[in-house]
Amino acid sequence: IHAIEDLLNPKIRFINRQISSGTRLLLDTSLIEQGIDPSEINGYLHEEFTHSAVANAILAGKADVGLGVKNVALENGLGFVPLKDEVFFIAMHKEMLSHPESSKLVRRIRSYSSKIPGYKAISLNRQVESWL
């Protein structure tokens, strides 16, 4: 498996994420962009609710492939093919920016993210005004 269109192989059993997840939104958006009918994917309707549950389904032999995050795949001895980078923000009231606990939070995120495969903390000192 190297790309979304590889899921069209009927011999490949797919395990999906639930419809409300960001992972599912990523998949469904990719399918629309590539003109792929989800009903042609073997297992598209089989859903799990966490990245770990997807990994466990693959390990249990219930599926051959599913979408998930790198650290969960590697923790479970599974292969990983990156499809997309995502950017997350920390949202807080302006008053919190000068609070010492906010600085501690940023340091912890930097420390933790550097230890988890697939994650990196970038631009944590940059403030984004009116990002909504």
Residue ranges and their predicted role:
Residues 55-84:
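A ligand-binding cleft/hinge motif common to bilobed small-molecule-binding domains
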Residues 32-37:
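Short helix-loop-beta junction
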Residues 2, 11-13, 112-132:
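N-terminal hydrophobic or amphipathic helices and topogenic motifs
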Residues 38-50:
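Short beta-strand-to-loop elements that line the ligand-binding cleft
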Residues 78-107, 122-132:
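Periplasmic-binding protein-like
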Residues 2-3, 53-54:
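Short acidic active-site motifs
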Residues 5-27:
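Short loop->beta-strand "edge-of-pocket" segments that line small-molecule binding or catalytic clefts
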